[in-house]
């Protein structure tokens, strides 16, 4: 009979409840972490937690940490490049039809503003009854000074300060200029105006407007009240044009006869300033001179520049331009559309107001509530003409040693603007035999049917940042969106287990 000892049999449990050894909670959490990442699809992590040997796990951990640090270092560089907000200008097209924009406004400004045939009527209209010889001579010198005056030569009117101005101190320059300046029918030859190969009455095409050169006759503008009325009754105003070349745009002829126009004592010959500007632009410093007995051909090559809306979050100072719905602090209390030229004239008018405590609506956009400069203000205007006629821009003093006086205007461009490149060809005008006329002929037309459009936009957008971030993470970590979702799921699962164990432990502790 075999004898079984207690060493050969399975020990029987003691009576009562069985007791199991509790594993430490830290070990349990670590096991869950290892188990989760050992079966994870996140590159490298399965090796960190799944390899048998310690040195292999350390090696893979160093590789994973190095890849993560390198990837996020490059991402930091990428973020810095994105935060710089670099702008790039690209040619969007060179074949944009010219009818996409308005035909430019064309202003004709005489060198001598006044028709001296109306001088006797001006004496009767503006002087008191029975003026003495001194007052008549003072008024005549005033007319002679204003005849050749524009905003760049106020010092000409300063000579009047040596005379007694008491008798004419009440006069307003605007009223006097409106009475004495040329009428449309006095300048243009009848039936000489043609636009888009269609004849027009010149006085229906051209309207009187104020510019920095004084009162001019302007075609296709939106500045004056009469011009804006045209837009209300004609949806196609300002005019557009689809053709190019000579005889396709605007043609007009000016009567340059001296018999009734010029002042006898004037030293300035008769001539015209031709100004090409945007329809909603007050004035333009770039002008051409039109001389009698010449035929002038002005070819306009427009260039359209636009700024992408993705730059809207940038500050105008960094963008260096303003959108239409943004306000420049120096461009206020005006109904003009914002562009650089309009900003400059508004800024200039504010300088005149602060310097001489009056305004000049005859040359600059009006300022509500500010009195108009009178004859008594001529000395202030003349003494400060060097300030008014020179504009200092930006930080030019860092680069230019300029001791001249002037005024400072911060006027960036409009983010969506146009630039007109022009070329002028002049030839001598041939008259019919025995003709005694003196004429100035001019044509303004597009040089080509198409134009170039340049668009400025951010070089690196949020989409570029996201795409480059995805490329860096894929290259160094081999991760994707699904990898991040899986990582968040694993961490969330572990966090939930940790919270649940903590709650159980808290309940056991409170019992």
Curated annotation (Swiss-Prot):
Gene that specifies this protein:
ppk19
What cellular component terms from Gene Ontology apply here? Answer: membrane; plasma membrane; sodium channel complex
One Pfam family this sequence matches = ASC
Q: Report keywords, A-Z.
A: Ion channel, Ion transport, Membrane, Sodium, Sodium channel, Sodium transport, Transmembrane, Transmembrane helix, Transport
Q: Which organism is it from?
A: Drosophila melanogaster (Fruit fly)
Q: Where are the transmembrane segments?
A: 59-79, 471-491
Q: List, in alphabetical order, the GO biological process terms annotated in this UniProt record.
A: detection of chemical stimulus involved in sensory perception of pain; detection of mechanical stimulus involved in sensory perception of pain; liquid clearance, open tracheal system; response to salt stress; salt aversion; sensory perception of salty taste; sodium ion transmembrane transport
Name the job this protein performs.
Answer: Part of a complex that plays a role in tracheal liquid clearance. In both larvae and adults, contributes to the behavioral response to salt. Probable role in sodium transport.
- Per its record, how is this protein called by name? Pickpocket protein 19
Q: Which domain of life is it from?
A: Eukaryota
InterPro entries in the record: ENaC (IPR001873)
Q: Which family does it belong to?
A: Belongs to the amiloride-sensitive sodium channel (TC 1.A.6) family.
Q: Please list the GO terms describing molecular function.
A: ligand-gated sodium channel activity; mechanosensitive monoatomic cation channel activity; pH-gated monoatomic ion channel activity; sodium channel activity
Q: Does the keyword Coiled coil apply?
A: no
Compartments reported by the entry: Membrane
Q: In which tissues is it expressed?
A: Expressed in the tracheal system. Expressed in the taste-sensing terminal organ of the larval head. In adults, expressed in hairs on the tibia, femur and wing margin, but not in hairs on the tarsi of the leg.
Would the keyword Transmembrane helix turn up in this protein's UniProt record?
Answer: yes
**PANTHER family annotated for this entry?**
AMILORIDE-SENSITIVE SODIUM CHANNEL-RELATED (PTHR11690), PICKPOCKET PROTEIN 19 (PTHR11690:SF300)
Q: List the membrane topology term(s).
A: Multi-pass membrane protein
């Amino acid at each position: 009979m075999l004898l079984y000892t207690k060493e050969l049999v399975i020990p029987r449990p003691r009576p009562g409840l069985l007791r199991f050894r509790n594993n430490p909670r830290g070990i349990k959490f670590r096991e869950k972490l290892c188990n989760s990442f050992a079966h994870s699809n996140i590159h490298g992590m399965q090796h960190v937690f799944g390899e048998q040997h310690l040195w292999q796990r350390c090696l893979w951990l160093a590789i994973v940490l190095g890849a993560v640090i390198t990837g996020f270092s490059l991402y930091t560089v990428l973020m810095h490049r994105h935060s710089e907000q670099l702008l790039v200008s690209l040619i969007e097209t060179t074949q944009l039809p010219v009818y996409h924009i308005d035909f430019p406004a064309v202003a004709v400004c005489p060198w001598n503003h006044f028709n001296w045939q109306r001088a006797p009527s001006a004496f009767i209209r503006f002087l008191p009854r029975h003026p003495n010889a001194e007052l008549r001579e003072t008024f005549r010198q005033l007319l002679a000074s204003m005849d050749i005056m524009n905003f760049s030569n106020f010092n000409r009117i300063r000579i009047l300060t040596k005379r007694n101005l008491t008798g004419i101190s009440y006069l307003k320059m605007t009223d006097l200029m409106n009475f004495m300046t040329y009428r449309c029918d006095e300048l243009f030859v009848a039936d000489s105006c043609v636009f888009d190969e269609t004849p027009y009455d010149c006085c229906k095409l051209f309207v009187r407007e104020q510019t920095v050169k004084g009162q001019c006759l302007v075609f296709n503008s939106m500045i004056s009240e009469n011009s804006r009325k045209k837009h209300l009754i004609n949806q196609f105003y300002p005019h557009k044009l689809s053709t190019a070349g000579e005889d396709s745009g605007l043609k007009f002829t000016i009567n340059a006869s001296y018999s009734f126009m010029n002042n006898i004592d004037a030293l300035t010959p008769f001539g015209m300033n031709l100004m090409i500007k945007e329809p909603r632009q007050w004035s333009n410093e770039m002008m051409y001179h039109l001389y009698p007995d010449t035929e002038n051909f002005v070819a306009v090559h427009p260039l359209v520049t636009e700024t992408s809306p993705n730059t809207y979050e940038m500050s105008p100072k960094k963008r260096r331009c303003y959108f239409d719905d943004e306000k420049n602090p120096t461009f206020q209390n005006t109904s003009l559309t914002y562009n650089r030229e309009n900003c400059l004239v508004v800024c200039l008018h504010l300088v005149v107001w602060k310097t001489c405590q009056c305004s000049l609506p005859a040359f600059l956009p009006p300022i509500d509530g500010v009195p108009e400069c009178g004859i008594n203000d001529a000395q202030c205007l003349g003494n400060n003409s060097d300030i008014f006629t020179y504009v200092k821009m930006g930080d030019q003093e860092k680069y230019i040693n300029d001791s001249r006086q002037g005024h400072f205007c911060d006027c960036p461009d409009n983010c969506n603007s146009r630039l007109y490149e022009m070329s002028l060809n002049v030839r001598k005008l041939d008259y019919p035999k025995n003709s005694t006329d003196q004429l100035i002929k001019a044509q303004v037309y597009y040089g080509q049917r198409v134009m170039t459009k340049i668009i400025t936009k951010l070089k690196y957008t949020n989409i570029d940042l996201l795409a480059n971030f995805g490329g860096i993470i894929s290259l160094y970590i081999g991760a994707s969106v699904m990898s991040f979702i899986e990582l968040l799921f694993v961490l969330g699962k572990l966090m939930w287990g940790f919270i649940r164990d903590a709650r159980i432990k808290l309940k056991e502790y409170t019992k």
